[in-house]
Amino acid sequence: MAVAGAVAMSGGILLLLLLLLLLLAAACVEAGELPPISRRSFPKGFIFGTSSASYQCEGGAAEGGRGPSIWDTFTYQHPDKIADKSNGDVADNTYHLYKEDVHMMKEMGMDAYRFSISWSRILPNGSLNGGVNIEGINYYNNLINELLLKGVQSFVTLFHYDTPQALEDKYNGFLSPNIINDYKDYAEICFKEFGDRVKHWITFNEPWIFCSKAYASGTYAPGRCSPWEMGKCSVGDSGREPYTACHHQLLAHAETVRLYREKYQFTEEVVRQSQFIHDNDLHRRSAKLSFIIQNYLLLGIHFQPGPGGRVCQYRH
């Protein structure tokens, strides 16, 4: 009882101190001791922007010659895996309301807009063999031109988790090396059509997130995982497929960057999400392996000096 009372008293004192600190901070703000945050609070040249992804906001899923992506199929077939059981058929309707969206960005004082291009809106069948969709190119030209008119820079992501369904049906998308050249062909169309106005390109958005959630847990399209995973998938191999997909993403990135540097060089980026792994005595080796896989597998390719062959070496 004495110990419990001491713990309760200690917790009460800590709570009181926290409340006092919050009141002190609020008083400082009211007294004007902390300057308000403004553009002057940031270094010269700092870019303020907003971002989106094509499937999450465009809508117009069956308009303008667009072909389906794996997310169309996933949301239609597995609405139970979507929190509100919605899909991207309409979404934010940016396909029709992009001028209003750009106007709001300008009103908010944004310097840049990072958006993704829908691969299947440019190549409805995923590859050059299926033909180029001029209506899709016109849509993105109109969006980019509207951004320029309002003084907003375009930061373009080429892939944000939305593999064309045609390529998923043809050879299982990023599980096949065939995706490398098809992705490069798609990227080159974008460089040719939009590169005179777009100076910032992002090859892949968070590649590890795509690989792990699409092929390990099955919670993202195309929803592949081993039977015992929480995604309750009908097909997949959580121990192999995420690494196969990541491998092909890295090769596609490398081929596209080589092409870009040789023919269209301005600047290129990749958006990565690194992970912090908690270490503990019981699972120290597992934590180390998880850290290497989630961070080194992809970071080492994009940043030099990287970890070299540590991922491959660790398998021993």
Swiss-Prot record:
PROSITE patterns: GLYCOSYL_HYDROL_F1_2. Transmembrane segments: none annotated. A beta-D-glucoside binds at residues 56, 160, 205-206, 314. It is an enzyme of class 3 (hydrolase). Glycans are attached at residue 125. Its EC number is 3.2.1.21. InterPro entries: Glyco_hydro_1, Glyco_hydro_1_N_CS, Glycoside_hydrolase_SF. GO terms for molecular function: beta-D-fucosidase activity; beta-galactosidase activity; beta-glucosidase activity. One of its GO terms (biological process) is carbohydrate metabolic process. It catalyses: Hydrolysis of terminal, non-reducing beta-D-glucosyl residues with release of beta-D-glucose. Disulfide bonds join 225-233. The keyword Ribonucleoprotein does not apply. The active site is at residue 206. It comes from the Eukaryota. Residues 1-31 form the signal peptide. Keywords: Disulfide bond, Glycoprotein, Glycosidase, Hydrolase, Signal. Belongs to the glycosyl hydrolase 1 family. This is Putative beta-glucosidase 9. It comes from Oryza sativa subsp. japonica. The gene is BGLU9.
